[in-house]
Every structure is written in structure tokens, then in C-alpha cells.
Amino acid sequence: MSTKKFLLEEKDIPTAWYNIVADMKNKPLPILNPQTKQPLKEEDLYPLFSKGVSHQEMNTTDAWIEIPDEVRELYKVWRPTPLVRATGLEKALDTPAHIYFKNESVSPIGSHKLNSALAQAYYLSLIHI
């Protein structure tokens, strides 16, 4: 019988988020400020997001953004997420490829959304919100 579940160790939790825009040859057009119709500036996002999140959102040059240690420690509650081999799907597709999915049900809320929400809460805590 083949292994269906693959569990990574805590030491394998990522240390940086990947920002794909930094590696794109053809970068997306800038987001326009709805009032001025000019390209949005980082500061325009401050009423909605913390400075840390705003900076990441507007960052088009750094491919890797370090995950703060405090966030990585909290990720350990449910990460790394188990990888599960989808042998039934492989068989249904009649493919020699190995297909895997991340089992996000081990997260306290049963989805990946907490990964982003936790980081946003962390950056807001830095400005005492």
C-alpha cells in the first residue's frame, strides 16, 4: 500500500512569503486611486490596512518577504498542512502523474484564510490596533 499522507515538520514552515509580482516580466498595471485616477500610493491604503500590509501590497520589487517570528510561531498551531495524495483522482484521470492536495481541515477554522488574517492582525498589533 502506498503512502497517502505526507506530514512535514515544523522546521519546514516557510520563513518568507513569495511575491510573484517581483519576478514578473510584464508587471500588472498600477491600481488607480478612485478619487484622483492616479496610480495608488502606499499611503492611500493606510486608512484600510496597516503600514506593513500596505507596504507588502504595493511592493513590486522584493520576491521574498520575511515572515515575522511571532507569526511563524503561531502558524505552528496548524501548520505545516498535511499533503494528501489524491489516488482516486489519479485513477479517474488515468494519469501517471502524482496529484496532491493540502488538507486545510487541520486549521482551526478549516481553511487557509487564517494564514493571511493572522499576518494582518500581527501588523495591526504593531500600531496598537
State the predicted function of each range.
Residues I127-I129:
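Conserved small/polar residues in nucleotide/adenosyl-binding loops
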Residues F6-T36, L40-Y123:
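Positively charged, low-complexity intrinsically disordered leader regions
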Residues M1-K5:
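Extracytoplasmic/secretory-pathway segments with low complexity and glycosylation-like composition
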